[in-house]
Design a protein with these regions (language model features):
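Domain-level signal for soluble alpha/beta catalytic cores
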Residues: 16-309
């Protein structure tokens, strides 16, 4: 997904000498995962046939290709294309202890839809002693991007993304210890918070916290509670990186999952502690574009201009 944003608000970064943002009317970046190149897709479907070094080589090559594509397109803020993730958030469950990973899809036939993704059972205390892997992904991106930074007239800005705790909680089944989705979210919150702190310590200049579940369910949920959860998640990194959140309505096999309206998010989501909000626009034919002005009074707005669906 290609995004364009009009940079105006940098209030949380006013005292950060390490942050560099180009003076220009529009900044461009990407959201979400690039498609896997054929070699990485083949490796991901035949892991037993490859050694660990083979997999690392395939991933490095895929990140290099995604990065090269973004640079040749002239994007201002680049990512690793999430080439080491099988999904923007599903891969993170492999880092969690205290869960039993769901195996095969609960439904394999019929039209593609969200009910083809199963959920994981919670078997104990939710922990992530190895982190969530995002810091290692960012270190790989830095190493690959290093030579490309030389000789550039403008700084090359690298961005990382991590799903927020409410979105992560969506694929975990409640139990006696964690009786509902909010209890699961609270258990995941410090795990995500620690990952964000690790990314900032690694030198991440731009950081997106993906919370599409909040935008999907804003129409029938306590949006003030969402804001409280989000702000507690990011409070330790506010002012230390350019912070954004991505709000969309789902894109599993080209299908939305949530009520596709921005209106239910406002005005409460304007209290998010972020410099920028990403809003889904292109695949909704720029419906509610008038809402951008309302958001822009409080923070920068990044608008999706390429329809990935």
């Amino acid at each position: 997904n290609i995004l364009a944003s009009w940079p105006k608000h940098t209030k949380t970064l006013a005292n950060n000498p390490n942050f560099i943002m180009k003076e220009q009317p529009l900044r461009t970046t990407v959201i979400g995962s690039y498609p896997f190149p054929g070699w990485l897709l083949h490796a991901s479907e035949n892991l037993d046939a490859f050694g660990s070094n083979d997999i690392a080589e395939a991933q490095n090559d895929a990140v290099t290709a995604a990065l090269s594509d973004q640079l040749s397109s002239g994007l201002d803020v680049v990512t690793d294309g999430e080439q080491t993730r099988f999904d923007f958030n599903l891969s993170f469950y492999g880092y969690l202890e205290g869960i039993s990973l769901e195996g095969e899809s609960p439904r394999k036939f019929g039209p593609p839809a969200h009910d083809q993704r199963g959920k994981h059972e919670i078997t104990g205390e939710l922990l992530a002693p190895r982190g969530l892997g995002a810091v290692e992904e960012f270190e790989r991106l830095k190493n690959i991007a290093g030579p490309l930074r030389e000789g550039r007239e403008t700084p090359l800005v690298l961005k990382a993304s991590v799903p927020g705790p409410f979105t992560l909680s969506g694929r975990l089944l409640p139990n006696e210890q964690y009786p509902d989705r909010y209890a699961i979210t609270e258990a995941l919150l410090p795990i995500v918070q620690k990952e964000l702190e690790g990314l900032v310590a690694a030198g991440c200049q731009e950081l997106t916290v993906d919370e599409p579940s909040m935008s999907c369910y804003a129409y029938n949920s306590d949006t003030k509670r969402f804001v409280d959860i989000f702000n507690r998640t990011v409070e330790a990194v506010v002012g230390k990186t350019r912070l954004s959140t991505h709000l969309c309505f789902g894109n599993f096999k080209g299908h939305a999952v949530g009520y596709r309206r921005i209106a239910p998010m406002l005005p409460d989501f304007l209290d998010f502690s972020v410099d920028e909000i990403h809003v889904e626009m292109a695949n909704r034919e720029f419906a509610e574009i008038d809402r951008i002005a309302e958001i822009a009074e409080r923070m920068d707005v990044a608008v999706g201009i390429v329809d990935v669906k």
